[in-house]
Regions:
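N-terminal Rossmann-like NAD(P)+-binding subdomain of aldehyde/semialdehyde dehydrogenases
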Residues: 1-95
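Conserved small-residue-rich beta-alpha loop and adjacent elements
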Residues: 80-141
Length: 141
């Protein structure tokens, strides 16, 4: 290899960890923003939960409110940074398929969260029973 190529590769290897940190920080920032929008007072979110309840009355607004409140509190910068600390952010992102369950409100969100925080690209198939809220979340992200 010539000197220029070697120097470029060395430079890339030195910057790669910084690039990964920046990318992961952007994902965390987007998730923190989502957490601020996950409130029972959010009209778009209310519309999505109401529409879901019309199609599947097992997923009540009260159960959604519990789940939304939980995720809103969980999606803080500090919590997310602690969560990802022991796990590497990938150098080679892959497409990861996620087929989401729909028996509990937002049960598939944890899977989406893990895929995004690891640096991969999520290809999701929301549950037909819980699709409107998940589609809202994906739209926000």
């Amino acid at each position: 290899m010539n000197k220029k190529v070697t120097k470029t590769l060395t430079y890339y290897k030195e910057l790669a960890p910084l690039y990964r940190m920046i990318e992961q920080a952007k994902v965390i920032e987007a998730l923190v923003h989502l957490g601020t929008l996950l409130t029972p007072d959010n009209e778009d979110l209310q519309a999505a939960t109401n529409r879901t309840y019309i199609e599947n009355n097992w997923l009540t607004n009260e159960n959604y409110a519990l789940s939304i409140t939980h995720w809103s509190a969980t999606l803080s910068k500090d919590n997310l940074q602690k969560f990802v600390l022991p796990y590497p952010y990938t150098d080679t992102p892959q497409r990861v398929g996620v087929i989401m369950a729909g028996n509990i409100p937002l049960v598939g969100f944890h899977d989406l969260l893990c895929v995004l925080l690891s640096g991969h690209h999520a290809v999701i198939k929301p549950s037909s029973d819980d699709k409107y809220v998940m589609l809202y979340i994906v739209k926000v992200l």
